[in-house]
Regions:
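Conserved active-site regions of diverse hydrolases
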Residues: 2-372
């Protein structure tokens, strides 16, 4: 059954690539109502770009047991299967969006492109040299925009890019990289000032995409960083309430207050700018507190890893610790590894982004943006 599933996946993939090649050899033809999906961000959104850069295994997931439940092989996604953008693409009736750096990436990008890089942040300095930072991801998007202008002309490309939707997830690694690299809880002496820099970089990237023609944007905010298994392992026994009061979770909340303020400001400044913002922080805390309410059995311990909460980042045995545990039923868990959701949890978050009400997603959801 597993081999049949893989075969079907590859048949679909090669069919799409063949269509792309045919299009690239003739005139590019895009349906008038086609809305593509462009993706920027970190490991929550990365579908394998880090497979193609010189980095460390901590920033890669191209080994088992990653990818085992859906693809039946590791794809570079930090999940047992699909990640959030995969489900968003499905809901938008688009095929899976390949990583931009994949050699057979969509040649004309009529469905969009995924630039996300695991471990990256909004700041160039965050894990510099081992990831593709948000600014570089934006520069890759500009290359795509330039190609589209050659194929469609300036007017056609602008119209296509205006119909498209851009989803962005950034910030978590900027805070985590600093706070977990330094032993002192005072590693960020001016938290609000640091948040302002991160938010400023995200704003700059949004405006760059807007200048190219982008008008419809989707965002998820930063999760409760100290409540991830990888962080709770360091303070074993801390309650879910307590971990939200620790430094990284506290700065995440500062970020999450600043992000909507910035977006509202851009909405006033940029004509036609529309956005959707999903409260990933609250949605994740809700799953962790009440897993059974959403069909899970375990909300705090990871499925794959070792140590307390299975939070030692050993999943797959390729990151310096060879021994690791793998749970029996992955779908029972919110977390797959020490800091990433299972496919089932990712689908839950994607659904909130797609059709979520104002409790978690506002002022629009992604479905509304795609239909505009």
């Amino acid at each position: 059954m597993g081999s049949l599933r893989v075969s079907v996946y590859f048949l679909r993939f090669y069919a799409m690539v063949s269509i792309q090649i045919t299009i690239s050899q003739s005139r590019m033809c895009i349906p008038e109502k086609q809305a593509a999906l462009f993706i920027l961000g970190d490991s929550l959104f990365d579908v394998g770009n880090n497979n193609y850069i010189n980095t460390t295994t901590s920033a890669q997931a191209n080994f088992e047991p990653y990818g085992g439940t859906f693809f039946r092989y590791p794809t570079g996604r930090f999940s047992d299967g699909r990640v959030i953008p995969d489900f968003v693409a499905e809901y938008a009736k688009l095929p899976l969006i390949l990583p931009y750096l994949h050699p057979a990436s969509y040649l004309d990008y009529i469905f969009g492109a995924n630039f996300a890089s695991a471990g990256s942040g909004a700041l160039v300095e965050t894990r510099q040299g081992t990831v593709t930072d948000l600014q570089t991801q934006a520069s890759y998007f500009k290359r795509v925009s330039k190609l589209l202008k050659k194929k469609l002309g300036d007017r056609g490309a602008k119209a296509f890019l205006a119909r498209s939707v851009y989803i962005i997830n950034a910030g978590s690694n900027d805070y985590g990289a600093v706070l977990f690299t330094n032993s002192s809880t005072h590693a960020i002496p001016n938290p609000q000032g640091f948040v302002d820099i991160v938010i400023g970089n995200i704003s700059s990237v949004i405006q760059e995409i807007y200048e190219e023609g982008g008008r419809k944007f989707g965002f998820s905010n930063v999760g409760p960083i100290n409540c991830f298994p990888i962080a709770r392992m360091l303070v074993n026994g801390s309650s879910l309430d307590a971990c939200q009061e620790e430094a990284a979770s506290a700065i995440a909340r500062l970020h999450n207050r600043a992000l909507p303020t910035m977006l509202q400001k851009l909405e006033k400044q940029l004509k036609g700018f529309k956005y959707s913002l999903t409260d990933f922080y609250s949605a994740l805390v809700e799953l962790m507190k009440y897993p059974s309410k959403y069909g899970f059995l375990e909300g705090e311990v990871a499925c794959c890893g070792g140590g307390a909460y299975r939070g030692d980042n050993s999943c797959g045995g390729k990151r310096g610790i060879e021994e690791f545990e793998l749970c029996d039923n992955i779908n029972d868990y919110v977390f797959f590894d020490s800091s990433h959701p299972t496919e089932t949890a990712a689908q839950h978050f994607a659904s909130l982004m797609w059709t979520g009400n104002s409790d978690f997603t506002h002022p629009y959801n992604l479905k509304q943006l795609f239909n505009m």
